[in-house]
Amino acid sequence: CPACDLHHYPRISPAIITAIVKGNQILLARGVNFPNQKMFSVLAGFVEPGETLEECLRREVFEEVGIQVKHIRYFKSQSWPFPDSLMIGFTAQYDSGQISEDPSEILEARWFDADHLPLTPDKKVLAGELIDWFVRSQTRESC
């Protein structure tokens, strides 16, 4: 503000998004609020105050599908203007637990092989890039 010399910065809502890999499979889910109910995607969720990104990832994954993860690695980020979010992408490895969907958020969650994927987001968005990363990682391993 020029009158009081205060700087105002836009508020953004940080959110994690993660590709979870178990051996040669990726965990994908259909969300309750997905516009296309046939589409599966990676898990995502908003960071809570006082929480690190890694803590958020572990919490969101456990809340949404009931599993534990390990070996969390930063992938990349993407601005998501609606609702003023910054998506921070990660990859993670499955650690333990059985899939148990939170019905308020997840309709279905399953493990998929790279060559048997359902309908997924376009590679232009971070979710699609994470899934593409998984597919390419499996192609490299089979060479």
Per-region residue spans from a language model:
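Active-site-adjacent beta-strand/loop module that shapes the phosphate/pyrophosphate-binding cleft
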Residues: Q78-E101
